[in-house]
Amino acid sequence: MRIIKYLTILVISVVILTSCQSSSSQESTKSGEFRIVPTTVALTMTLDKLDLPIVGKPTSYKTLPNRYKDVPEIGQPMEPNVEAVKKLKPTHVLSVSTIKDEMQPFYKQLNMKGYFYDFDSLKGMQKSITQLGDQFNRKAQAKELNDHLNSVKQKIENKAVKQKKHPKVLILMGVPGSYLVATDKSYIGDLVKIAGGENVIKVKDRQYISSNTENLLNINPDIILRLPHGMPEEVKKMFQKEFKQNDIWKHFKAVKNNHVYDLEEVPFGITANVDADKAMTQLYDLFYKDKK
């Protein structure tokens, strides 16, 4: 009997000890043993909204959350420094699916699995927010953020659908020295559609196409949006010069009616970001400012 009693106590003790160790291990993971390195600004801003610490951040001229001010920089989003990242001993290095192919050599040098998230549209970003919440124990924060974005989107769509006429919109995405035309497949194109605008470009298989001003004149948009990507002040000056020196622009209805607008990188940008609520609201107000 004594032997049986002793074995029973021993088994119970082992079970309790194992349970405690398991609980401790799970709690350790929950309490932030993740060492996360986002390689893009959009991901960095999203992690901030999810109340997640990071050990590395992308190098950018944009203002990042103050909570990350002392976090080491790891280089540009498409060219992160492998050695700088390795020094941080990350558990997760995050990127976006748009540049997945370009980032594969980087992950190979790191000898790490790549984590890619869809930030090509509002819907894609919201799905990614849910994934990040599940992955890093921030489900409640992810739900709260998505609920807010859904609420703003629904309000904008409900107001837009009541408008009798929807403006035809041309979207130009500029980089220093040149510009492209954005389609519905781009993030900014997605926002324009949500806000009640009709993109004059009907291409379905690409996010951006090259510009042909003569063809654009034939579809004569009501509104022209100009969005900078990188070096915004330089791009803004480039657009101003183009519209002043290229005579064809003066024949556009949008130019004649002074309906050409320069968008700011914040809250817009070429990839989805957590400022989408502000971007949707600004576009709606722009499209229907005379019909409130």
Curated annotation (Swiss-Prot):
Belongs to the bacterial solute-binding protein 8 family. Its cofactor is heme b. This is High-affinity heme uptake system protein IsdE. PROSITE patterns: FE_B12_PBP, PROKAR_LIPOPROTEIN. Induction: Repressed by fur in the presence of iron. A lipid is attached at C20 (N-palmitoyl cysteine). Involved in heme (porphyrin) scavenging. Binds Fe(2+) and Fe(3+) heme but the largest fraction is Fe(2+) heme. Functions as a high-affinity heme binding protein and probably has a role in relaying heme-iron from cell wall-anchored isd proteins receptors to the probable permease IsdF. It comes from Staphylococcus aureus (strain bovine RF122 / ET3-1). Heme binds at V41, A42, S60, Y61, M78, H229. A lipid is attached at C20 (S-diacylglycerol cysteine).
